[in-house]
């Protein structure tokens, strides 16, 4: 089944799960409250549902990342976190019923709200923590926050928000008094906690028994190195070209841990290599590691370029800097299966000395159909390739030199988020259908005017409007 259809079906299923609580509650009991109070309670229940489901859309469930792609999973995670925040900010102002008198507090009824004491405080605290989560996620780069610090803070705040939110709903909610909804939310909360425990407690314990050892560290350029690791016992996990892993250095404890694309795999030697750029403390420590030191991994994730070598269309790979890494595994697989289709590789860097000689890492003699075009934004006088950014003009020039019609090609893009956005915008101007473009990002600039961003926002807006429409319908019917 085509990936696009799978993603559409998955999205419909996700929306169905979101509205499930307001569909299963006892509607006869719901009709005894005013419309506004019903609507407010409904969107609050859906918001809590979103927050608990976020634990399963963090990108750490291998099945989802392999079949739906990291791009889809993280987009859904990030966008619907904002939907939940909007619902939770709005819902207190929709209520029309008064609160219980101070001299006679009590649970929510058909005539009064139950916003008193710990129930009220927990709701306010959960909302503040959720605002902090979204703010840190949006402003991490501007604040120059270390990735490991942000991940730990994000996880900790998510636990706080979910626990306080669940307590708030159980303490002051009107419809949550129904046994069916209590079971649903408590079960979902337990499953969310178990998913967290699996990722950060149980999985590290299993990783400690499946260690890897560093066998080689090769400096490829001044800021990029190839880290080769070997599994000490057993065989390598199943790895497809273009996938990535989570890596820990020195210890299997939950933190620090970082994602890296898998560049090369040698199943016979039980080795894999990662192309890494030094951008912070963690990668700098890896570059200075000693041969034989232990590495612990969680692999493999993602579906980037999974179907690149199954198509009859010409393949165009566009990499910015360290975005070369996943393409090395794709090219290695293409060589292994004697791939005959045209492959055109566009490789951009800021400086010439940052260009990696792919032929030194992969024997490309068998890939007769491969052509490589380099682009340098700050060239020296001796440089003879294309100059500037990976933009419309350079992409068009490169494709013309390779005698390729962009409308007939499949495009795979990897690199910094801004570079991916710019490349997708350029391909839109070349009339390349979005279905022929594959890119995988960890962060998203929703202000970028690209076909993918517009489609993502449209999907989220339509889904949100559908949720609101169902909530209104249930409140009125």
Language-model segments: which ranges?
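Short, conserved phosphate/pyrophosphate- and ester-handling motifs at nucleotide-, phospho-/glycolipid
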Residues: 77, 154, 242, 323, ...
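Membrane-embedded alpha-helical bundles of multi-pass integral membrane proteins
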Residues: 2-197
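Hydrophobic alpha-helical transmembrane segments in integral membrane proteins
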Residues: 173, 177, 197-213, 256, ...
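Histidine-anchored nucleotide/phosphate-binding helix
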Residues: 324-338
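Conserved beta-strand elements of the Class I
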Residues: 314-318, 410-412
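Ferredoxin-reductase
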Residues: 206-296, 312-314, 349-351, 362, ...
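A short, basic/flexible loop-to-alpha-helix module at the beginning of a structural domain
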Residues: 300-311
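Reductase modules of NAD(P)H-dependent flavoproteins
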Residues: 2-13, 17-19, 97, 159, ...
């Amino acid at each position: 089944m085509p990936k696009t259809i799978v993603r559409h079906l998955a999205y419909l299923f996700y929306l169905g799960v979101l509205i499930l609580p307001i569909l299963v509650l006892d509607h006869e009991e719901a009709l005894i409250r005013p419309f506004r109070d019903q609507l407010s309670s409904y969107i609050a229940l859906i918001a809590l549902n979103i927050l608990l489901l976020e634990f399963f859309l963090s990108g750490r469930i291998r099945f989802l990342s392999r079949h739906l792609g990291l791009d889809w999973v993280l987009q859904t995670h990030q966008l619907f976190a904002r939907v939940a925040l909007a619902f939770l900010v709005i819902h207190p102002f929709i209520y029309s019923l008064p609160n219980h008198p101070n001299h006679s507090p009590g649970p929510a009824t058909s005539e009064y709200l139950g916003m008193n004491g710990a129930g009220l405080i927990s709701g306010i605290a959960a909302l503040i923590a959720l605002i902090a989560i979204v703010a840190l996620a949006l402003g991490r780069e501007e604040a120059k926050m270390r990735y490991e610090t942000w991940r730990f803070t994000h996880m900790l705040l998510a636990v706080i928000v979910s626990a306080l939110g669940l307590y708030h709903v159980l303490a002051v909610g009107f419809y949550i008094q129904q046994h069916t909804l209590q079971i649903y939310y408590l079960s979902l909360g337990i499953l969310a906690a178990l998913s967290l425990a699996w990722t950060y407690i149980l999985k590290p314990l299993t990783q400690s028994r499946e260690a890897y050892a560093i066998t080689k560290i090769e400096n490829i350029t001044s800021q990029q190195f190839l880290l080769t690791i070997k599994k000490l016992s057993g065989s390598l996990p199943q790895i497809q070209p273009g996938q990535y892993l989570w890596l820990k250095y020195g210890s299997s404890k939950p933190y620090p841990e970082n994602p890296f694309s898998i560049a090369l795999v040698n199943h016979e030697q039980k080795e894999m290599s990662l192309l890494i750029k030094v951008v912070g403390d963690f990668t700098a420590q890896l570059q200075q590691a000693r041969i034989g030191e232990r590495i612990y991994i969680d692999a493999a994730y993602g579906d980037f370029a999974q179907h690149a070598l199954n198509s009859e269309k010409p393949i165009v790979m566009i990499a910015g800097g360290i975005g070369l890494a996943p393409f090395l595994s794709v090219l290695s697989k293409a060589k292994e299966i004697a791939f005959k289709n045209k492959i055109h590789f566009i490789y951009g860097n800021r400086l010439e000395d940052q260009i990696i000689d792919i032929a030194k890492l992969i024997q490309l003699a068998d890939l007769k159909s491969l052509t490589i075009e380099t682009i340098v934004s700050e060239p020296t006088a001796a440089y003879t390739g294309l100059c500037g950014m990976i933009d419309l003009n350079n992409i068009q020039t490169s494709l013309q030199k390779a005698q390729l019609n962009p409308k007939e090609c499949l495009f795979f893009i990897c690199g910094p988020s801004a570079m991916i956005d710019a490349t997708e915008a350029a391909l839109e101007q070349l009339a390349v259908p979005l279905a022929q473009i594959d890119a995988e990002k960890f962060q998203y600039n929703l202000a970028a005017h690209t076909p993918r961003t517009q489609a993502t926002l449209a999907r989220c807006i339509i889904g949100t409007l559908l949720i609101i429409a169902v909530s209104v319908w249930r409140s009125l019917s």
